[in-house]
Amino acid sequence: MMRRTTFREIKNTFGRFAAIMAIIALGVGFFSGLKMTKPDMMNTISNFLDKGNFYDLHLLSTLGYTDDDVDSFAGEKDVLYAEGGYSLDVLYKNQGENDRVLKTMSVPENINKLSLVDGRMPEKEDECVVDAKMDSIKIGDVIEVADDDAAEGEDSSTQDILKVKKFTVVGTVNSPLYINFERGTTTLGNGKIAGFVYVSPEAFDSECYTDVYVKFDREFDLYADEYENYIDDRKDEWESICKTSVLDRYKDILMAKGMTEDMVKDITLDDADGVNYYILGRETNIGYVCFESDSDIVNGVAKVFPVFFILVAVLVCMTTMNRMVEEQRSMIGMLKALGYGKAAIMGKYMIYSGTAAVVGCAGGYLIGTYVFPEVIWYAYHMMYIHMPLERTTDWTLVIGVLAASLLCTVGTTWFSCRYELSETAASLMRPKAPKPGKRVFLEHIPFIWKRLKFLRKVSVRNVFRYKKRFFMMIIGISGCTALLLTGFGINDSISGFADNQYGEIQVGDGVITLNTSIAGDREDERFSSLKDRLEEDTSCYDLVSESTWDLVHDGGVKSVNMVIMEEPEHVDRYMKFADKDGAEIEYPGKGEAVINTALAEQYDLKTGDVITVRDSEMKEIRVSVSGIFRNHVYNYVYISPETYEDQMGEAPQYKSVYFNLEEGADSHEISADLMGDAATASVTINKDMKNRISKMMESLNYIVIVVILSAGALAFIVLYNLTNINITERIREIATIKVLGFFKNETSDYVFRENRVLTTFGIAVGLVLGVFLHAFVIGQIKVDMVAFDTYIAPMSYVY
């Protein structure tokens, strides 16, 4: 019988049952979905990189590496694979299309293996596979090396390196080297690489490899600190290995030119002008680095927002079950009078609530962990390669959300039943005595109370007399309002983010990184050729010392960009120093530093505080903070040349150039021209950084939309549930009012007037809570690359 009455109860109160189920499902789905998004994204990229044997070290040398070098590297400690390859930038023409620069590489065998998207791999020298993100080149197209592919300043043209000048596209691929949309810059064409091409190694004609990739036999989790420490140790070891290899190669070249063994035996790399080698880790791969930052942003939202979301859902569920048991007093009393034990009676209501919890939790988890990661991953397709999301299952999370769902429903039901069952059957079968009348606060203010009409006085009394109902409505509505405001606030904080950073704060057009340090001397012969190009191509330029230092303060260490302007009075050409209120900040004087807001907030720094910055050789500079400027991207410490020289005993080494372009100038054409100079190591165009940040923010917009829609759905279900409870528990009161002759609209107004008052209260409280919740959530979205403003637009309060 009890089983039958339980199912009958579910059938008769299916609206309430469905509401509980929906709240649980929405809360669990949102919480679990966002929580599982980063693990799923990480698992997908990790599996892709593992299948492709993504490199651990990338070795470069101006002399290249031979097969003997590669064989030697393969025998070193912990090495699983060492593989040489060819890569160069090539200007192609494509059947009447505009010429474009494509990174052309040899198909790898063991490291950075390609993932075939469509077609097949090259089988002949004149076949190639292309970047799957390049929609303009199709399978079957023929791409041909352009005649004017050699850029000024290059020692040899691609005509000499590539044996084959025309390739037929036979497939499209994804490469572990290019997991996001960035393809890099070049000295050719318009200065931008449009995509990549892989051809057979036999298509190259070179006696040495341009690149060597090394894969170690140790496995670590993606982005793990243990991996970073391991690679740092390996890099130190490989310094001597590469130095020996490059020196031997240099001596072989000299001997091939006629020098004897005795003549070259004492030569060192310091004697070799223009000979350099580089040992690069994954941190130089833009896609790899950006993915960590992007996934951290997702995790920042998922860290706190879903917790508040599920708390609101849990609270409403607990209230609903508590009110339901109170409504069922007569039924509980009757069952008790019929001889049913406490366990049997409790079981009926616990099965009711438990069924709603289990079904809602299961449905919410399955739908949430599918929909939320899928939607967010789809958004990231704008920035990253297309691949199916590979999901993971976190059984700890499954057990946790199920336990929380049961606790807030079954647990509440148990406590409520236990309280009701403590009374006698006769007492339970009688309706609960109404609460004694009390004067409410407004009755003590005659000026207001006397002016209220009778029905409004009744509504005011009811609002404040039934405190459970009051707090239930206030907490439920304010919680949903706070969640909605937070969602809109996140959108306000990220919209216009890139335009603000690269339009109002960083106003320079680009940065050149020099091959050789120029100690503040513009007349240095190493700088003279680049200076001519700069004076022709730019409207202004300034030498800058920009390097990575560690800020050491209060037991913490943070990597920062140390910037020293050669001519500090020119800083406003490239950077606008202003605090959060917009007040201008002066460039720091001797013994002073200006830092960005994110650093100041992280270490609780104020103007006048003393900080220490330390370089890689453990040399330190102590400075007083003279200003804190608004900045969103990266962390900066600005000091004066005098400060550096005073504390380090030498002039700064200026290895960067900030520049601005003339109005309407093509930044990428000028970038290509500047890259053609021997003194230039790289050119960064701020417009490209702006586009990269904008794409990151566009992806985050999808998360915001999901958050707002979910919060809106929760608000709807909560309001439905609370209104349903409010009306159901007042059936007798409504009947009495109708008997007294109230019209239908007056009866409705009597009930809903209270709802409107409580809803207004709840919204007001929710807007205040939303400000704090938004600030808290934004504070949790912390990544090394970006920092967001805590800003809510006025219209968001209206929405």
Predicted regions and their residues:
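Juxtamembrane segments of multi-pass membrane proteins
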Residues: 454-590, 597-598, 609
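C-terminal transmembrane helical bundles of large multi-pass transporters
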Residues: 655-657, 671-779, 783, 787-790
